């Protein structure tokens, strides 16, 4: 049936597209529902493109570290789209003792998980980035963090997922989710009812409303 799939993903941003791509690579039948008229037109087109491990909850780090090492370096080649990914490191800046305490806590927890991150003083911060003012007294420094272009990366996930058979449907704003025998299976829009064994909500700032 046209409105059924193994997995329905709500949200056509970079997260929804990435989930769709990796599921489709494993042969999963996927539908992506996007409430707007364009794929990647929400938060995925309005961010700095940070690809970072530092500053995260330690529970996220094993997955993020795996992605940095094994997934991001080959994406442009896989997609035949330049994601503009590069690893120039990430500074998380502090101006006072309170900031330093927070950064030290984040750094300590990340090091325990195995991340290459350390605290540096203001002088070393300015050796890395001479344009920063003397107000910056400390920072955490993670040399394997980086950046990518969120627009081209989302496009790459989208184009490649489509080639793998993912069905993308725009203009389908989800208004209700329904359970069948205790399991979330139905996704309702003003125009259609979709059904899947698994439903993933990846709608960014609109996820709470859904």
Q: Which residues are covered by each model-predicted region?
A:
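Helical element adjacent to the flavin cofactor pocket in flavoenzyme catalytic cores
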Residues: 140-198, 202-206
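Glycine-rich FAD pyrophosphate-binding loop
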Residues: 24-44
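Dinucleotide-binding Rossmann-like beta1-alpha1 core, especially the glycine-rich loop
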Residues: 48-128
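Conserved Rossmann-like nucleotide-cofactor binding loop
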Residues: 15, 38, 206
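Conserved dinucleotide-binding and phosphotransfer motif residues
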Residues: 26, 113, 164
């Amino acid at each position: 049936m046209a409105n059924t799939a193994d997995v329905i993903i709500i949200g056509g941003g970079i997260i929804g597209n990435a989930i769709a791509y990796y599921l489709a690579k494993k042969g999963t039948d996927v539908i992506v529902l996007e409430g707007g008229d364009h794929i990647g037109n929400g938060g995925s087109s309005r961010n700095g493109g940070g690809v970072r491990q530092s500053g995260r909850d330690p529970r996220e780090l094993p997955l993020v570290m795996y992605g940095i090492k094994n997934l991001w370096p080959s994406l442009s080649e896989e997609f035949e789209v330049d994601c503009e990914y590069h690893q120039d490191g990430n500074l998380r800046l502090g101006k006072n003792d309170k900031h330093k305490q927070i950064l030290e806590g984040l750094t300590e927890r990340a090091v325990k998980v195995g991340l290459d991150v350390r605290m540096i003083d203001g002088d070393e911060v300015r050796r890395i980035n001479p344009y920063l003012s003397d107000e910056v007294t400390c920072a955490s420094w993670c040399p394997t963090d980086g950046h990518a272009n969120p627009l081209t990366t989302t496009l790459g996930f989208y184009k490649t997922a489509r080639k793998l058979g993912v069905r993308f449907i725009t203009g389908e704003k989800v208004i209700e989710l329904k359970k069948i025998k205790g399991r979330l299976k139905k996704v309702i829009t003003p125009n259609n009812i979709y059904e899947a064994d698994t439903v993933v909500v990846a709608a960014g700032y609109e996820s709470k409303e859904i």
